[in-house]
Amino acid sequence: MKLTKEKKNDCLVGVSYIPPLNFFTLTFLFLLRIEKVHLSLSLSLSLSLRFYYFHNVCYPSLFLFFCFVIPFFYSVRFILLYLHILRSFYELNILLLYGAENSRRQSPPGYYVIR
């Protein structure tokens, strides 16, 4: 926790540290996660193709599972995760914005407000 001091009306008020998160950093992190999923999906797809071609055994259900079911599961999962991160980020901004205003009004002079 980083605590900064602010001089206002002859009293010290503590302001909590706001992490440098915004839409672009969240999008970048999300794309990194998708790239990791893409690599794992390509690996699983190559393994399923190896089973399909090199062993001369027809596994249509396994092939369909690796080609369609797993990518669909990962895409839905990561879209929901991204929406959850965005929602919690905006809730954090609202909490920090209104919480700082309320704590400045309610804090007695000479005390730190630690959140």
Swiss-Prot record:
The UniProt record lists the keyword Glycoprotein: no
Main localisation: membrane
TM stretches of this protein: 12-32, 53-73, 79-98
Source species, domain of life: Eukaryota
Stretches assigned to the Extracellular side: 33-52, 99-115
The UniProt record lists the keyword Transmembrane: yes
Annotated localization: Membrane
Identification of the protein by name: Putative uncharacterized membrane protein YLR311C
Organism: Saccharomyces cerevisiae (strain ATCC 204508 / S288c) (Baker's yeast)
